[in-house]
Amino acid sequence: MKYGYFDDERKEYVINNPETPSPWINYFGTGDFYSLFSNTGGGYCFYKDALLRRITRYRYNNIPEDMNGRYFYVRDIAEDGETSVWSPGWKPLMTKLDSYECRHGLGYSTISSSKNDVNAESLFFVPTEHNCEVHKVKLTNNSKVKKNLQLYSYVEFCLWNALDDMTNFQRNLNIGEVEVDNGTIYHLTEYRERRNHYSFYSMNREPSGFDTDRNTFIGQSRGIDNPECIEKGISGNSKAHGWYPCASHRLDIELEPGQSETVIFVLGYIENDDEQKWLSDGSLNKKSAKAMISALSTDEQVDEAMADLAAYWEDKLSHYSVKTDNEKLDRMVNIWNQYQCMVTYTMSRSASYYESGIGRGIGFRDTNQDLLGIMHMEPAKTRQRLIDVASIQLPHGGAFHQYQPLTKRGNDAIGGDFNDDPLWLIMAVGAYIRETGDFALLDEKVPFAGTDGHPLSDGKETIMADHLKKAFHYINENRGPHGLPLIGRADWNDCLNLNCFSKDPDESFQTVVNVDSGTAESVLIAAMLVYSGRELADLGRASEGKTNALAGEAEYAIKAVDEMSNIICENAWDGEWFLRAYDANSNKVGSSENAEGSIFIESQGFCGMAAVGADKQYNLKALDSVEKHLAHQYGIDILAPAFTSYDYSKGEITSYPPGYKENGGIFCHNNPWVIIAEAVAGRGDKAFDYYKRIAPAFIEDISDLHRTEPYVYAQMIAGSASQTPGQAKNSWLTGTAAWNFVAISQWILGIRTSYEGLIIDPCLPSDLRHLEVERTFRGVKYQITIENPEGKNKGEAMLVPFAEGTEPCKVVYTIK
């Protein structure tokens, strides 16, 4: 069953039923102000950091679900006094509408609805040049009689720190402050004290009434689905003093038949320097707020801001596009996959409908992978993020696992000592320099972090190349009894905790003190070392003559790669597939000898990507085992058989019910590793088959089962051992987005970067006979035509050397 459809021409997903299986959301924001917006108007906004600068309040785990956001109420008063009340976005009133349509576009959403011959068209977006949301509401009278209407707005303010806001009520119920000035409601909580920021909600009409106190607006023992002010058609003109600050405007409107009225609301954020917080008379400095409101007060100004937003996304998506005879493939590559990559890069894993914005910031591992999906669109932002993330690396080569975006200070709030972390930096930096030719990054001054998360102040000057060397040496030189890298707290699979041994339900697997076994080893990290070691060696050789920052590192890396490849084949080959690990007692994990968890996807995928054991056809055998034991119609399970009881020697992975999350779920993030491995092996039909099993556009028809948005990837789909196979959770913020874009754009379609130019090396399904790719590379537009007349999977790779120029470079490649 579907709940909408793709409008590829407008780059929108159109939802025609408000009761989607879960809230289907969109993201707004291109700079520092960001918003989450559901198909019924739910969600919230924040400035830079969803934990520390939350602007509007949102209640996770609420009943009904998704029941706070930016809401509007229409009160329709008939001549006989009868009234009907409805919400243009369906929620919060949930009155049955005569029509409803939500369109999620690139950085904006619209909701069109009607009730009793009144049509409401609402536009929501964050402009590229302002720290605010714009809400434009147009009401039209389609009846033959005059309509007397009341339009109410409603948002609820968060008291900035989202965690404190939901826990510290003994204080917070006393500190809320607001000010109302000419229809603009200012939220000033703590501005008199330590804060230099405030928010506001304005309307470009003189309001008929307002409220800033939630209790006054809603009434006693009621909710936002039945506010007392809406029922009575009044406003309390209330001023919040503590309790629950909110912002509601009321506008009384008369519409003749055929007449329309448009109202513009701005929900904004302002920071003032300390010396400019107050005017000379001691009043709030509203200069910046009034300038923002003035810049967005007319239809023409809003239209211009929307045009700027459209141009922004048009530019981003112009850097890579494909044209084939498969419209689902084209829409994934050209629109939705790249859009999700940008959102995931921006949010990391901090703020979604599954991540509360409280527990996680910008992850070291996460962001290095996310950059793989956006660096062709955003090289400058990629460069800065690489510097930021390298700055939370520790001097020994390990790293803090995350940092908060507002402070950029490393922290162990969700654990540390994940020994895969350092190697992702090598992959991301190498990919960035291949993309841009910016070898100067290697000499960029980047400090290491001290144990407090702040930049180390030991007087030593370090550069980016030092971080890459430390990362590689740290992993290569910390090995276990079988010569494989030590796993630490965990590797990419956070829940494979081989040194944890936790029996206390009140402990976190991610933060509990681990046993320093010195024996638990990761085959995944070993394969990553081979893969990233080749990247480091290539980078070292390519940088010769440009910088001495990596002098001698290529030789070290290649020696380590050759040694580790041999060790994997000798000590981690199980006969039909690669082991996953050795535990703290040197027992095999992911072996045919194990009754449960006998095969894992990660080591098969990454060993295949790195072509470990290819001379012995180990990669092909491992991939065949994936197909036999892990693959099914909804994707590839992370492991099989699923664990049925808790095993404290393996940790959190065994605490999940069978078939969910890391215990046998389809962890979509590593499905593309297998897709790439199949492409490396030249098996294009199988690579594309796996791609289609989890790509949202290809599974839209099972939206009632899948539940999450049919236009973006989810982190997890319930696996074959679960009670609900095919049901997804945790959409939007997942490394799945970047890795699937890498898999399809670089390995199936086969357009990859090198230090010398572009490599054209497609591995196609046999029924894809012709395609055209436009790829911007170092400022040059490449127009690449790929012909596959005989329906083959793969041909010989071709290098197109880079040459600067202003004219498009046209290339024709034929698979022979």
Regions found by a protein language model. Name each.
Residues 636-663, 764-788:
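Generic long, charged, amphipathic alpha-helical segments
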